[in-house]
Amino acid sequence: MTKNEDGSRNKETFDLLTKAWRPQKKEEVDINDINILFDDSPDGILAWDVYGTTLFYAANLVPIIADDIVSVDRAMQWGFNWSNGPFKAMDKIGPYKIIDKLEKEGIELPYMLKVLKENNAESFYNDQDEQLSPEGNWISI
């Protein structure tokens, strides 16, 4: 940020391509568009690198540090004020879209995505207040 003689301020950003400072411009990205995770644009690549790796990490936490997916979701919701935990988020995004992207990139599936796929489950939660267990069966929440 630079300060002008009249006291006003200009927000600037360092442009990595030109290696010079330039005025900051507001980027228009629809953060509610979950399809951006699967876009090959710079925005999509960044979104996947940040959020996709978070979901990947979470899908490997069960059963290592948590006994079930609800514990991971609640920890993220209660501890970090997420509106949805990572497993509920994956259900909204579509677990098989994530699986397809990981397989296309040659990445081994994290544990709970493997469980979901091997048991032909469509989601981590169902509409009967049940969750997919690490063993691949439906258990009460």
Predicted regions, residues:
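N-terminal glycine-rich phosphate-binding loop for ADP-containing cofactors
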Residues: 1-141
